[in-house]
Amino acid sequence: VGRRLTSDVYDAYAYKLGLGQRTGVEVNEVVGRLTKKTDKNYTSSLDIQAAIGQGNTVVSPIQLATYAATLANNGTRYRTHFVKAILDTNTGEVLSETKPEVMDVIEGNGNTFALVRQGMTLVPSTISGKISSYPIAIACKTGTPQRSETYASGKHYLNAMMIAYLPAD
């Protein structure tokens, strides 16, 4: 699928989901990058790698959180914030409140987002540990990002990660 889509199409959707760009969060953040045909090391095999989040693709944890929230919101991407409101500790009065700001909307193709969300709700049952029996329905996706650095043996370092949102319903 990655070869047929090519990184051009894949990157366009990844960008709309919040990857490869600033999220708008209130603190400094890294932009990351998406694999592009203009990359110096580009070959068509990078299209396949980019489709699974590898190749020259680099994303930040806050971009992944934005991505998960966009899936949860049926393709509507909101500006990401760490703070919903600032309250006066003495009175409880709201001093400042963050208003939702739509950054992009991905027009779904039929029930695409529903299928993705449904798949994400099945993942916890495949994971051992407390997440599989958590009392609130969780939607998640696991991954194993590969780093460019290698061990002396030549094997790549791997990082375990997971994006999630709850409640899943």
Label every PLM stretch briefly.
Residues V1-D169:
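Beta-lactam-recognizing serine transpeptidase/beta-lactamase-like catalytic domain environment
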